[in-house]
Amino acid sequence: MSNLSSKLFRGNLVIRIAIGLVLGVLLAFISPEWAKSVGVLGQFFVKSLRAIAPILVFVLVLSAIANKEVGTDAKLKPILVMYVLGTFLAALTAVVFSFIFPTRLELVSSPGDLTPPQGIGEIIKTVVFNLVDNPLQALANANFIGILAWAIGLGIPLRYAAPSTKIFLNDLSEAVSYVVKMVISVAPIGVFGLVAETIATNGMNAFIGYARLLGVLLGAMMTVIFVLDPILVYWKIRRNPYPLTFICLRESGLTAFFTRSSAANIPVNMNLAKRLGVRDEIASVAIPLGATINMAGAAITVTVLTLAAAYTQGIYPDFMTALLLSIVASICACGASGVSGGSLLLIPLACSLFNIPNDIAAQVIGVGFIIGVIQDSAETALNSSTDVLFTTAVSQAEDRKES
């Protein structure tokens, strides 16, 4: 028992998380009531991550830009290209899987208090309005687009500030990073609570009726994770991409799978990027930006569920129409973080391409909520792990050129 306690509280973080995961599963099967009770540990962990993430991003970006080194802008451009390309290829992969495995839905009612966006213009409007949000509201509401805008806006003039100001900002950044390390250190306990509550509440039989739909979704996501993303990484680093891919999956994807929040996983990704040698001035901008626009998982969800809705209505789109859907899904996915409800609420917008009525599209959202425990977890794991994967790959490629 003392050996187990040592591993759980002082050992390697990944091993500790794995132990917490296994213990959570066991508790859910042994005593579901107790498992639901310990769910508060998981809720506390997620709330802690969400609480620290906005101030972490603001302080780190502000400090990084104020102390910015020459050449950072050149490194951000290829990272943005990777984000956009990865999201589009993910949507295209979802189209291919949906064509090979066409899926019909058992439609149910969706929650009545949800209001999906009415068009791409509304999504763009949301993003632009978030960009000029009040800085205090942006921090309070975890509006990362607004936080980035204010941090960059203040950071640029602070590059000309006195050295003492830059030292203060750097010290403040170190202090926030220390708090983040403290929060991450309790990740095994948080994962234990999240897993125990999830399995005790939903059970393993809740997803059988939607096994085919989940199979298409997860198959597309796995293809992106283990085939397309490594190809993109190899394009940058020109060596075996899988060691880096597996590190990012193990240390970022696993946590994101259970927190189901890209924003909450930002501190985890920042910590991992630092250990992988990514400079702070790169990671502090690229990682939060990735949590906002790098949405491969969301693009897959929107594409698969939209095509499933089309098949259910007897609509069989040709490949060019599906290609257009991929482009629309990619654009929509980039705005998913700016829409309450995430990728599921963007489905009616994509369904409008096929003239699918809004009431049918709303029922597709209901299906999304049924499978959401698995779908949202896998989607977030893909989204968040590729943030740090692409950032690290570009950083290593640029460092190799400079050496």
Swiss-Prot record:
<feature type="transmembrane region" description="Helical">
    <location>
        <begin position="11"/>
        <end position="31"/>
    </location>
</feature>
<protein>
    <recommendedName>
        <fullName>Serine/threonine transporter SstT</fullName>
    </recommendedName>
</protein>
<keyword id="KW-0472">Membrane</keyword>
<dbReference type="InterPro" id="IPR023025">
    <property type="entry name" value="Ser_Thr_transp_SstT"/>
</dbReference>
<keyword id="KW-0997">Cell inner membrane</keyword>
<feature type="transmembrane region" description="Helical">
    <location>
        <begin position="213"/>
        <end position="233"/>
    </location>
</feature>
<dbReference type="GO" id="GO:0032329">
    <property type="term" value="P:serine transport"/>
</dbReference>
<dbReference type="GO" id="GO:0015826">
    <property type="term" value="P:threonine transport"/>
</dbReference>
<feature type="transmembrane region" description="Helical">
    <location>
        <begin position="138"/>
        <end position="158"/>
    </location>
</feature>
<keyword id="KW-0769">Symport</keyword>
<dbReference type="GO" id="GO:0005886">
    <property type="term" value="C:plasma membrane"/>
</dbReference>
<dbReference type="GO" id="GO:0005295">
    <property type="term" value="F:neutral L-amino acid:sodium symporter activity"/>
</dbReference>
<dbReference type="InterPro" id="IPR001991">
    <property type="entry name" value="Na-dicarboxylate_symporter"/>
</dbReference>
<keyword id="KW-0029">Amino-acid transport</keyword>
<keyword id="KW-0813">Transport</keyword>
<keyword id="KW-1133">Transmembrane helix</keyword>
<feature type="transmembrane region" description="Helical">
    <location>
        <begin position="285"/>
        <end position="305"/>
    </location>
</feature>
<feature type="transmembrane region" description="Helical">
    <location>
        <begin position="319"/>
        <end position="339"/>
    </location>
</feature>
<dbReference type="InterPro" id="IPR036458">
    <property type="entry name" value="Na:dicarbo_symporter_sf"/>
</dbReference>
<comment type="similarity">
    <text>Belongs to the dicarboxylate/amino acid:cation symporter (DAACS) (TC 2.A.23) family.</text>
</comment>
<dbReference type="Pfam" id="PF00375">
    <property type="entry name" value="SDF"/>
</dbReference>
<feature type="transmembrane region" description="Helical">
    <location>
        <begin position="175"/>
        <end position="195"/>
    </location>
</feature>
<keyword id="KW-1003">Cell membrane</keyword>
<comment type="function">
    <text>Involved in the import of serine and threonine into the cell, with the concomitant import of sodium (symport system).</text>
</comment>
<feature type="transmembrane region" description="Helical">
    <location>
        <begin position="81"/>
        <end position="101"/>
    </location>
</feature>
<keyword id="KW-0812">Transmembrane</keyword>
<feature type="transmembrane region" description="Helical">
    <location>
        <begin position="51"/>
        <end position="71"/>
    </location>
</feature>
